[in-house]
């Protein structure tokens, strides 16, 4: 279920993508699980990004949304899991490649 994508630097990275549907501006949530980062207490977390269908458009959304702590997974609602990354809009895939560099 974890999606592997090649970023703009040519490195394969693992992301999880979720979809809230078209009722919200920041429809897609991307969890960058390839980076195993620890906070000041040694707890692992993953960077989370949010974007619209066209994150590079002046009226689009494409931003860092915070951090995901796996041990607190019951506290998050990211939407429905996207199983096939290739089914995403091309601009969203481009955004994922950019943020995972």
Please place each PLM-identified region on the residue numbering:
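Short, charged/polar N-terminal "headpieces" of proteins
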Residues: 1-27
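Short acidic DE-rich linear segments
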Residues: 98-101
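Acidic, low-complexity, intrinsically disordered interaction modules
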Residues: 19-86
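A short, charged, amphipathic alpha-helix used as a generic interaction element across diverse proteins
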Residues: 88-96
